[in-house]
């Protein structure tokens, strides 16, 4: 029985291995872009195509993957390349109109839907691969950050890694279990383009490989997620939202371009295609148009893999269906998967694969009799299709009962997660033994917070409600108000125009029950006092927000960033919208001057993407908060070095007069390409003793070539300049790969943690820091006294006051940080740490927020503190249990350690943003946690969760 289970796992793994035979963005990346574009589109004027697609998703999904069919199959690389460009769409549209007169038959409709999928694939590859003049597409940026600028390495890892990112962090249940490919029509289109080698047989076989790979990703691709998470933090963090070539951007551009094709298919002149799409018919474009696909994650070429791949393909069910074929997997595959799932409860996958797979693969003769005379070229990653036997059934033949293919394993409770996460059950003690520092285990609390929080949800798909949150007393009544962004808000045809909501607490219908034992739920429209909305598609209005009195009239103003403004002309300049507040209404309530912005600031150069980071702090020692812009993608004298601009608040800020980015009162930029200077910005201290601290998490040392060590640059205030100096006081850099120093940090006066003799403590998170393979990217949060730092310093030489280490791989422990008191009478502040990718199972999890009382692990005794600094022996807090409980935040229970919160909703990114606010006006601060991809009500609609 044990060997049978292993063989079943091998079948699954071999399906996944076929992923490597596919080029371009991975198959399911293309499927996801196409389906997301369908949801983004209004089909205004082309409503029939929306109906066609909705009734033929099996055709649509096959079309979205199709252009990659021949790169490693049948020697059809040139034909596959041809399917990526506008001439193919022109030829296909001409064939459609000549072959299928209106009203279209089912075969005509299927071909039209298939071509919409093909178009999505073509558009997605442009920005993904930086083709046709696009210089900073996703793979280029990934190479610049994670692969020392080596495009080919990034390319392979992005194409395959995106599949595993999707399978792990997203729900693929929508992906069609059956695919239909219009074989005859596609063959005829290629022949009309003078590609005679494309025939029924190789179209059938090559598309079978595409289908097998897609189903492999859907069923079990999540188990390969650690491969890409380890290699590319960039892909994990920015696969969806990277400004040019991320999932959303590729989907928006597909929705921009579909009307051109639909117009052709409705009889409009077949001419130039979409703006983003370069054209081989244009000589200026032609030299840029070869995709040159290569891969690197899964190594092909082994005969055992090839033999087993053939075996899997032989199990596939292929049915003649009109002018095409339908691909499906038999129910026997479902039964095999069920056996594996049942076995999981007894034998975690980590031990099964670790114990048996090496022997199975090393002893190839058990599965494959090697032919000594056979010559095999390991450099050619091509599946030899000649010997694959595929039986094709006729459509009228009785079929098995349709059942959806089961995925591993959104709804299955796997035991012993630590086996996969840490390899060995005793690995927690391994880390303990490695550390020479005092380790304090965290206490767990049995009280269930699930009965004591209120959730407010976003109102439409992909709205990312809760992407940013702020709390400020807008109307001056002494009560905290909430400002919540939803940069993905929009309607089909005009998606991601974005909205920002504000809730004036004394007028809100939201009430949080303190102990009645139920969870309250609201939609944002039920409780919002008002909202401000953008009108530019895909501008991401609300990506970052903040509040200050910009025109010094005594009334707060709302600042809103829209970093993808000017996307429709591929400039991505970005825009800042400033809504001046007023109290001129009869009731004296706070409102904005208008629903339109009072003042705007626009980016100037390509990829400025201003509005990515907004912060407020006093920057000219006049006790008034000023506006700070961080633009990490901006050129800064190179490529994505990043810039920081500061605009002082002033009575000269007048409604109706835009501000030029060149008129900034302060300007700084990064030094190394892709360092992302300005990703985080804080101001420490006050008045003329203040310091500007700018984070560059992707900074790398060009001499050592260690990537993503990160840095924080400190610029002291210069009284003579009435501004921060351009020469740094200190530059602190990381030392290890993926330290990402500068990703997230906060500043606090030492007295809040009981250290009255320390002025400025930096609470610094290193969310991708790892401690060996067993604890890769578990994250760490450290407390540093920065009072005496100067010059160039490596973090390993900095004396730490406290270290808090995460325990869950790739959880992004420290993505968000918050320091504050629950009650004004509390003597010391708490530290809250967000880990939005945290999980407690083999599957993706909900995310989590941890809270600690640092003062209980620090000392106010100057002698002891001095000795700790001399010995470099900070206290280390470490949770070795993997046991996460929720609890009431006001229930101390005498605990000195940490506790945790989560909303128990998978894939929600709970903990992405956190803040404290007395939202229910009871005199105590409430913890407010955003989960910007919460899909429990609507797909990636997002939510905020309010804990009393």
Swiss-Prot record:
Gene3D superfamilies referenced in this protein's UniProt entry, alphabetically: Integrin alpha, N-terminal (2.130.10.130)
Gene name in the database record: pldG
Lineage: Eukaryota, Amoebozoa, Evosea, Eumycetozoa, Dictyostelia
Localization, UniProt: Secreted
Recorded catalytic activity of this chain's protein: a 6-(alpha-D-glucosaminyl)-1-(1,2-diacyl-sn-glycero-3-phospho)-1D-myo-inositol + H2O = 6-(alpha-D-glucosaminyl)-1D-myo-inositol + a 1,2-diacyl-sn-glycero-3-phosphate + H(+)
Biological processes per GO annotation: cell adhesion
Biological role: Hydrolyzes the inositol phosphate linkage in proteins anchored by phosphatidylinositol glycans (GPI-anchor) thus releasing these proteins from the membrane. May also cleave GPI anchor intermediates intracellularly.
Enzyme Commission identifier(s): 3.1.4.50
Cofactor binding, note field: Binds Ca(2+).
Primary localization class, coarse: secreted
InterPro entries per the UniProt record, alphabetical: FG-GAP, Int_alpha_beta-p, Integrin_alpha, Integrin_alpha_N, PLPC/GPLD1
Pfam families: FG-GAP (PF01839), Zn_dep_PLPC (PF00882)
Protein name: Phosphatidylinositol-glycan-specific phospholipase D
Coiled coil (residue ranges): none
Keyword Lipid biosynthesis listed: no
Glycosylation sites per record: 39, 78, 148, 300, 433, 452, 506, 535, 749, 788
Top enzyme category: hydrolase
